[in-house]
């Protein structure tokens, strides 16, 4: 997926006045570009994409006079995994993340506890066969063992002690009638929240919207980031 062309973020930058960067990953031996988040078949790779993302962000902040405390990350699939990877670093520079079809690898995260409070938004299809909802702890798909969606959410919910929760049934996605459930966890202490958009019968894709036909998924993500600046 060419996220810069199809996600809808570019139009939003013009409307709301923020900067969107679309970094390209390194090409692997299979001819596919990737961000190095610890997949099994990239275990010999020395690519440091955390350093790359940090340096890219620092340059944009300096050159464009941006707010260094208002840096966010989103992406789909490997890009979603990279968003989690950035957020799970010992000293993350991102303020909030919004992965689509993302996950966290088991290796290195067995006892994961977030080091920085931030809000997290995940969009995930229940029938995703690439980044499986229930994960792949036995590494059947050869990506490397990774956690299921609910387990990933639990890292952040428990790490931030978010005790309040609710589930809201949203309107169907008009284009294909898929149903969406929004899971939300939060606290009365601050504005930290974790959102999970569960797309029933959803596949491995970037949905057009999340139940509001007039609001794109990109616009929902921007709204999430905007209120957590």
Could you describe each region identified by the protein language model?
Residues 213-229:
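Catalytic active-site module of serine/aspartate enzymes centered on a nucleophile-bearing elbow/loop
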Residues 1-72, 76, 81-89, 114, ...:
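Serine-hydrolase catalytic machinery in alpha/beta-hydrolase-like enzymes
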Residues 126-193, 208-215:
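Active-site-adjacent alpha-helix of alpha/beta-hydrolase-fold enzymes
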Residues 201-205:
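Histidine-bearing beta->alpha loop at or near hydrolase active sites
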Residues 115-120, 190-194:
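Short, proline-enriched alpha-helix->beta-strand connector loops that line the catalytic pocket
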Residues 4-9, 103-112, 177-185:
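Alpha-helical scaffolding within the catalytic cores
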Residues 122-124:
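Short beta-strand/loop motif that positions the catalytic acidic residue
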């Amino acid at each position: 997926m060419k996220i810069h062309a199809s996600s809808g973020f570019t139009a939003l930058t013009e409307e709301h006045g923020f900067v969107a960067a679309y970094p390209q990953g390194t090409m692997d031996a299979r001819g596919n570009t990737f961000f190095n988040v610890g997949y099994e078949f990239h275990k010999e790779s020395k690519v440091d994409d955390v350093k790359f993302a940090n340096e890219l962000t620092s340059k944009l902040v300096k050159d464009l006079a941006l707010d260094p405390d208002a840096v966010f990350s989103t992406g789909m699939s490997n890009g979603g995994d990279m968003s989690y990877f950035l957020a799970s670093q010992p000293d993350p520079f991102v303020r909030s993340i919004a992965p689509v079809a993302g996950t966290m690898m088991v290796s290195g995260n067995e006892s994961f506890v977030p080091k920085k409070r931030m809000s997290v938004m995940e969009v995930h299809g229940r029938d995703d066969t690439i980044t499986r909802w229930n994960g792949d702890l036995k590494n059947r798909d050869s990506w490397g063992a990774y956690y299921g969606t609910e387990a990933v959410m639990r890292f952040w919910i428990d790490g931030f002690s978010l005790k309040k929760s609710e589930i809201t049934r949203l309107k169907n996605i008009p284009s294909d009638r898929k149903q969406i459930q929004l899971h939300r966890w939060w606290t009365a202490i601050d504005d930290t929240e974790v959102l999970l958009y569960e797309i029933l019968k959803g596949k491995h894709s970037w949905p057009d919207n999340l139940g509001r036909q007039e609001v794109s998924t990109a616009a929902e993500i921007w709204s999430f980031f905007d209120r957590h600046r």
